[in-house]
């Protein structure tokens, strides 16, 4: 049988699992009831997971379990219980986002295959290389990559690369969306996204400016396979079984060289049709769409038709059989799938009164494998002359043998737990004085004399600092280059050149918000300050960041204050203490007009249903941040953050005068005036 990249289907519940497997998926991904990125799905029970895995393995289908949410220190004991259950069930891989959880899995179950969730924001070769260093076997690449960018990563890594080929497209780069948590205390990074992006945000009079059409690349699977993609992922653990059946069937058709039934796919679920905009590098307004009444009506019309796809099990696994019939002895049938071998005994053959059983008659009876995952590939007969076995006896022999083979295939093999490792490095000493105050500037124009005098550490985006190297001539040790939040593979070399040149001019440190930028800074020989985008909210994640080379870390602004206080980190920690929090990282700016970027100078906005404007800040025309309209203020609560080593004032759209005034408020402890937010620091996040 020709080997192809796997079709990986979502299984939000038992019905979806059955639809995926019976329609021909090679693998499924599913979550337990807790600690997965689709908490709203039916999900699976820890106690019955071994049976689920066994049923899939009997059919040659791999099972990946998603443990891909951020977890607090307080939740770790319960999460460890889930991990142990997953390992005991003999699954084929575990998807994670949290750096700390990846660290624990690698230490506790070193042979359990580790998969990097798309929430890890892997979008370049540097990020993939760092995952390899951490022991990952498979990576889900960011959805925002083009054909050429996918090819570059596949060619440069030994990991299996997984790519989304069908389903919903998030507006934000996965793992970097905080819109649901900041607006509604339901974190997408913790599996609770409320999808506020599907609400009616307006841009230049255009509605639903954060709602993208669904993706489909189902007609390009052979092309993707040629690029080196090893796994075709279908999104949709919240979708109906019919959706899963249609998507898997379309993928099967595509891999067989047929034209996939996109019309049925569009009918079962779409948002004004489909897009392939990121893959084809056409990041424009044609990518946007919403779910219409017509879309819903089309779905109702095809659901009955799709239910027929999952009525019968189709054999997918070839087996070889050996039938032995000797005088006076029970007939035996041995069956093998190439790995497992079973043998069963049946009735004693009789002397034939008419036609004896020959290989042709036996083949006709034994090839009827319907209702099982098997089909007969080869039959060898050792049949004594003049013997006869009734067809009913041959059928019973076949059924018993195939049942025994399925049972042998379904035996789960738990992963061994490694001996407890030595204790983690000792935590850092708590700061003796007040936290150091630093400023992150969006542009060099915000660099005022007051900022230069009053802030300890100063950071600028890499491209800004590269254009103003004279800033390093005095106090170079204070400056930090903020690496791009999104750096496509073709931009990596330019980033490395800029880093090395700035280092020659005195730069000593870099601010890194993803794994790719972390590795680039490390290879440039710079001190590394982990940024909020690393999503650190627990002690193991802080320890893993230190192991990867971070000298200091900025905790996620989704980390509640009490949880932050209790993080045991071997390196200094800090938080964002002021700023318009970045709610989304975007590669397709919703502020574009039909003419493109036009005369936009990097600052734009979209407007919600209440008339509130959300700023859009473009970085070097490479990516855009959607910002919270209300700035985070802690200026009057600073004593409550004395456990931090540093606090960062994150300036974005502020004028130089506003930057000066805000810095003075933090120096004096003044209370904020006007609309502001405390962010998520004093809220309980779901």
What role is predicted for each listed range?
Residues 134-135:
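Hydrophobic alpha-helical bundles that form the membrane domains of multi-pass transporters
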């Amino acid at each position: 049988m020709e080997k192809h990249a796997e079709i990986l289907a979502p299984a939000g519940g038992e019905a979806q699992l059955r639809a995926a497997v019976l329609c021909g998926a090679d693998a499924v991904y599913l979550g337990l009831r807790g600690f997965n990125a689709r908490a709203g799905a039916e999900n699976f029970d820890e106690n019955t997971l071994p049976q689920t895995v066994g049923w899939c393995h009997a059919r040659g289908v791999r099972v990946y379990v998603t443990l891909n949410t951020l977890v607090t220190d307080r939740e770790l004991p319960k999460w460890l219980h889930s991990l142990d259950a997953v390992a005991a069930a003999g699954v084929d891989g575990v998807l994670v986002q949290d750096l700390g959880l990846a660290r624990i899995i690698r230490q506790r179950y070193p042979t359990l295959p580790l998969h990097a969730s798309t929430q890890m924001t892997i979008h370049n070769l540097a990020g993939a290389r760092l995952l390899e260093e951490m022991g990952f076997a498979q990576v889900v690449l960011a959805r925002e990559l083009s054909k050429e960018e996918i090819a570059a990563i596949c060619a440069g890594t030994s990991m299996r690369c997984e790519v989304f080929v069908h389903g919903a497209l998030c507006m934000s780069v996965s793992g970097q969306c905080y819109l649901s948590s900041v607006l509604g205390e339901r974190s997408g990074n913790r599996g609770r996204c409320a999808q506020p992006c599907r609400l009616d945000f307006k841009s230049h009079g255009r509605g639903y400016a954060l709602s993208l059409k669904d993706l489909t690349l189902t007609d390009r699977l052979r092309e993707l396979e040629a690029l080196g993609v090893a796994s075709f992922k279908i999104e949709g653990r919240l979708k109906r079984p019919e959706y899963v059946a249609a998507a898997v069937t379309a993928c099967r058709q595509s891999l067989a060289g047929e034209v996939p039934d996109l019309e049925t796919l569009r009918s079962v679920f779409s948002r004004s049709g489909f897009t392939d905009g990121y893959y084809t590098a056409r990041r424009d307004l044609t990518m946007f769409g919403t779910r219409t009444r017509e879309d819903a009506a089309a779905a109702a019309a095809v659901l009955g038709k799709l239910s027929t796809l999952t009525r019968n099990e189709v054999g997918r696994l070839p087996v070889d059989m050996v039938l032995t019939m000797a005088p006076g002895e029970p007939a035996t049938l041995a069956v093998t799938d190439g790995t497992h071998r079973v043998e069963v005994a049946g009735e004693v053959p009789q002397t034939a009164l008419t036609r004896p059983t020959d290989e042709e008659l036996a083949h006709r009876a034994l090839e009827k494998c319907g209702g099982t995952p098997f089909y007969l590939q080869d039959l060898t007969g050792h049949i004594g002359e003049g013997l006869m076995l009734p067809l009913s006896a041959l059928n019973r022999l076949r059924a018993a043998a195939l049942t025994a083979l399925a049972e042998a295939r379904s035996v789960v093999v738990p992963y061994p737990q490694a001996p407890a490792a030595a204790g983690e490095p000792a935590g850092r000493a708590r700061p003796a004085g007040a936290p150091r105050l630093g400023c992150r500037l969006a542009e060099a124009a915000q660099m005022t004399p007051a900022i230069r005098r009053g802030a300890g550490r100063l950071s600028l985006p890499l491209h800004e600092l590269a254009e103003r190297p004279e800033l390093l001539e005095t106090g170079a040790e204070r400056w930090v280059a903020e690496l791009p939040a999104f750096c496509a593979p073709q931009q990596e070399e330019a980033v490395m050149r800029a880093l090395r040149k700035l280092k020659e001019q005195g730069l000593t440190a870099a601010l890194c918000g993803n794994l790719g930028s972390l590795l680039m800074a490390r290879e440039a020989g710079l001190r590394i300050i982990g940024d909020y985008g690393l999503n650190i909210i627990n002690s193991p994640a802080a320890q893993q960041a230190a192991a990867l080379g971070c000298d200091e870390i900025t905790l996620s602004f989704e980390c509640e204050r009490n949880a932050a206080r209790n993080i045991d980190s071997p390196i200094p920690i800090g938080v964002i203490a002021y700023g318009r929090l970045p709610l989304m990282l975007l590669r397709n700016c919703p502020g574009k007009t039909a003419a493109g970027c036009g005369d936009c100078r990097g600052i734009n906005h979209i407007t919600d249903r209440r008339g509130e404007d959300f700023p859009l800040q473009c970085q070097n025309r490479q990516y855009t941040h959607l910002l919270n309209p209300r700035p985070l203020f802690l200026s009057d609560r600073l004593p409550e953050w004395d456990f931090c080593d540093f606090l960062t004032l994150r300036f974005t759209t502020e004028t130089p005068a506003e930057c000066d005034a805000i810095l003075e408020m933090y120096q004096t402890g003044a209370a904020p005036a006007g609309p502001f937010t405390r962010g998520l620091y004093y809220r309980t996040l779901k």
